[in-house]
């Protein structure tokens, strides 16, 4: 029953972030925000849903380089204890270790399960 679905919404980055298209970026975020509820409504009790990004791009900033190194990590699971906010820094290796633990796989490397 355990599986992994990875979806990369590259359009935020390639079509709007690097192009500095603030209006397009806003529309894409609004569209994505409207999809979160239906996605979570279809999740099963043992599912773990993680939303994050590899970097940020402020579409109002000049140039085409990445403008944000810190990005949010949003986690949903019906079996998680509670909703909480944290300023804790979570690295990609931690996301990988958390997914591995959820799937029952021994993680390799230095990451830690953040749940």
Indicate where each model-derived feature is located.
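Feature captures the catalytic ectodomains and active-site-proximal regions of enzymes
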Residues: 1-115
């Amino acid at each position: 029953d355990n599986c992994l679905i990875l979806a990369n919404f590259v359009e935020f980055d390639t079509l709007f972030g690097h192009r500095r298209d603030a209006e397009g970026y806003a529309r894409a975020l609004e569209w994505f925000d409207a999809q979160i509820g239906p996605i979570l409504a279809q999740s099963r009790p043992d599912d773990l849903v993680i939303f994050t990004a590899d970097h940020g791009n402020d579409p109002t900033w000049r140039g085409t380089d990445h403008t944000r190194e810190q990005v949010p990590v949003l986690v949903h699971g019906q079996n998680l204890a509670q909703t909480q906010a944290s300023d804790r820094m979570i690295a990609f290796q931690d996301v990988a270790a958390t997914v591995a633990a959820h799937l029952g796989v021994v993680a390799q490397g230095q990451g830690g399960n953040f749940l």
